[in-house]
């Protein structure tokens, strides 16, 4: 049953309280939620109102949730408040770990749970807006979203196949079914009385327009939270990102903040002010910085790269310290291009950004092989060079943009530590000392589920590295090759004994560059790109 929209009077968009708005959500509706981690573009007031209504009335029931980007704080925010039995029956997310209470329901087999790659998911919403049945892509071949593996299903109660293997001109592709949502929760900064909306205080745009079009064109209700309203036709047309005819309900929250817990607006993050970054940084020399330093060695002048969340996100700061940050461009999948990369849950809230694209377009660029290099953090690696991040230690994290980015980037740099669980190291006198070994081995014999396929990467001619604090590996046809080790570590005791398989030891095995282990600027000069 399609939801019933409130009427417009004299062209004015209905302005309701959040509590009134969520009364328009019927049982069995499919709700698509905009937002990224740390409160970016999150319609918190609407989410809270829906969660509270269900607690009090046990309605609406059996919703399906679509969330392209991981929103939340890795605890109780984001869509975690919606994780109530009976409220949600089904979920399709690009990333799960930012809202872990939803992940808990999936892990306990209490909801049907799917994971599409984040970029693919936003593209299927664009397809839904155009009334196309889905998208066809080679992104995800050989990974857990491939129907020959798990088909993107995250638990035992998830049975229906949403992803199919198809073939055109003797080449394999995946067909991803587009799910048309009935309700949208989106957010902007300002709208006029007819619903035309601007994003001047926001960090980025994500796929707000795509979601609104998908819901509108399928007869649903677009609910938009804003911080303020203005007179109709007074917003600059080039600033308007959402046309008013897409919006059915507006909820005004004058206390809406740009991110969780901060001032209402940080003008550096919104792009209005430029931060003076001329002062040289000096980051503490630890294992995180060590990995980022070694990763920087894989960058080339003029390259366009992507940086992911986790230990990999230090590369931009190390490049600033070395004075070469302006010699290449780092992008984030949610839309930012250039600037200083943020860290933590509000990943993508960059400053000094050069441009901001909508997320769907950013992924089009990635899928087509536009990236020269990407820097991604890994959870586990197996003997075939496969990487796992979407599910480990029994926890569902989801892929985010990991599959989209790593499938086609010309050079792929995976960053992490060799072991996990209370690993402690110190760097002194140009050497690495393992003070306390991690309890958990991260290099295992076989991954139970694959987020990155080493086999497919080799078939596509991609260059793959795995950089840790004590060892560097590269991927070849016969598996992982150990090519560098840190000064101060023992090859057998500190590396081989801490892996569940034995890599090929390169005959040219060498020590990692000694400059990495000295607590001073390395004097690193970016190499020219090969032509």
UniProtKB/Swiss-Prot annotation:
Formation of the covalent enzyme-CoA thioester intermediate proceeds via an unstable anhydride species formed between the carboxylate group of the catalytic glutamate of the enzyme and the carbonyl carbon of the thioester linkage of the substrate. Keywords: Transferase. It holds the Pfam family CoA_trans. The keyword Transferase applies. The gene is ydiF. This is Acetate CoA-transferase YdiF. It catalyses: an acyl-CoA + acetate = a carboxylate + acetyl-CoA. CoA transferase having broad substrate specificity for short-chain acyl-CoA thioesters with the activity decreasing when the length of the carboxylic acid chain exceeds four carbons. Exhibits high activity with acetoacetyl-CoA, propionyl-CoA, crotonoyl-CoA or butyryl-CoA as donors, with acetate as an acceptor. When acetyl-CoA is used as the donor, propionate, acetoacetate, butyrate, isobutyrate, and 4-hydroxybutyrate can be utilized as acceptors but not isovalerate. May play a role in short-chain fatty acid metabolism in E.coli. It comes from the Bacteria. GO terms for biological process: ketone body catabolic process; protein homotetramerization; short-chain fatty acid metabolic process. Belongs to the 3-oxoacid CoA-transferase family. The active site is at residue 333. Homotetramer; dimer of dimers. Its EC number is 2.8.3.8. One of its GO terms (molecular function) is acetate CoA-transferase activity.
């Amino acid at each position: 049953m399609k939801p019933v929209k409130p009427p417009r009077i004299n062209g004015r968009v209905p302005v309701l309280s959040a509590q009134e708005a969520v009364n328009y959500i019927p049982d069995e509706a499919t709700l698509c939620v905009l937002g990224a981690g740390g409160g970016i573009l999150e319609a918190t007031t609407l989410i809270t109102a829906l969660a509270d209504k269900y607690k009090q009335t046990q309605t609406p029931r059996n919703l399906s949730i679509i969330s392209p980007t991981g929103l939340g704080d890795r605890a109780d925010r984001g869509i975690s408040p919606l994780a109530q039995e009976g409220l949600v029956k089904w979920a399709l997310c690009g990333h799960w770990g930012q809202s872990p209470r939803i992940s808990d329901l999936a892990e306990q087999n209490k909801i049907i749970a799917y994971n599409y790659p984040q970029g693919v998911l936003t593209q299927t919403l664009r397809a839904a807006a155009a009334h196309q049945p889905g998208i066809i892509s080679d992104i995800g071949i050989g990974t857990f979203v491939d129907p020959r593996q798990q088909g993107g299903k995250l638990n035992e109660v998830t049975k229906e196949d949403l992803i199919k293997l198809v073939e055109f001109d003797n080449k394999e592709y995946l067909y991803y079914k587009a799910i048309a949502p009935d309700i949208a929760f989106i957010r902007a900064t300002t709208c006029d009385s007819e619903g035309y909306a601007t994003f001047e205080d926001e960090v980025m745009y994500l796929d707000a327009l795509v979601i609104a079009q998908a819901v509108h064109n399928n007869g649903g209700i677009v609910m938009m939270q804003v911080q303020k309203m203005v007179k109709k036709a007074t917003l600059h047309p080039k600033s308007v990102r959402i046309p008013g005819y897409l919006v059915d309900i507006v909820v005004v929250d004058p206390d809406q903040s740009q991110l969780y817990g901060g001032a209402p607006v940080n003008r550096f993050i919104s792009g209005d002010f430029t931060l003076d970054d001329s002062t040289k940084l000096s980051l503490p020399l630890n294992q995180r910085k060590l990995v980022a330093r070694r990763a920087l060695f894989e960058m080339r002048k003029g390259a366009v790269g992507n940086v992911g969340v986790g230990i990999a996100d230090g590369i931009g700061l190390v490049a600033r310290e070395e004075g070469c940050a302006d010699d290449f461009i780092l992008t984030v999948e949610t839309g930012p291009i250039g600037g200083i990369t943020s860290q933590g849950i509000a990943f993508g809230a960059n400053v000094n950004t050069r441009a901001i694209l909508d997320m769907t377009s950013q992924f089009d660029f990635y899928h087509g092989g536009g990236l020269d290099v990407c820097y991604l953090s890994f959870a586990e690696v197996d003997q075939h060079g496969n990487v796992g991040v979407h599910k480990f230690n029994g926890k569902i994290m989801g892929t985010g943009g990991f599959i989209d980015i790593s499938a086609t980037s010309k050079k792929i740099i995976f960053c992490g530590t060799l072991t996990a669980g209370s690993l402690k190291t110190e760097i002194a006198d140009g050497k690495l000392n393992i003070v306390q070994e991690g309890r958990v081995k991260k290099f295992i014999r076989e991954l139970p589920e694959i987020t990155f396929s080493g086999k497919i990467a080799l078939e596509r001619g991609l260059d793959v590295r795995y950089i840790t604090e004590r060892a560097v590996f590269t991927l070849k046809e016969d598996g992982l090759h150990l090519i560098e080790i840190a000064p101060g570590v023992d090859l057998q005791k500190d590396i081989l004994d801490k892996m569940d398989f034995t890599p090929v030891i390169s005959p040219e095995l060498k020590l990692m560059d000694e400059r990495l282990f000295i607590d001073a600027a390395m004097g690193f000069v970016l190499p020219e790109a090969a032509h």
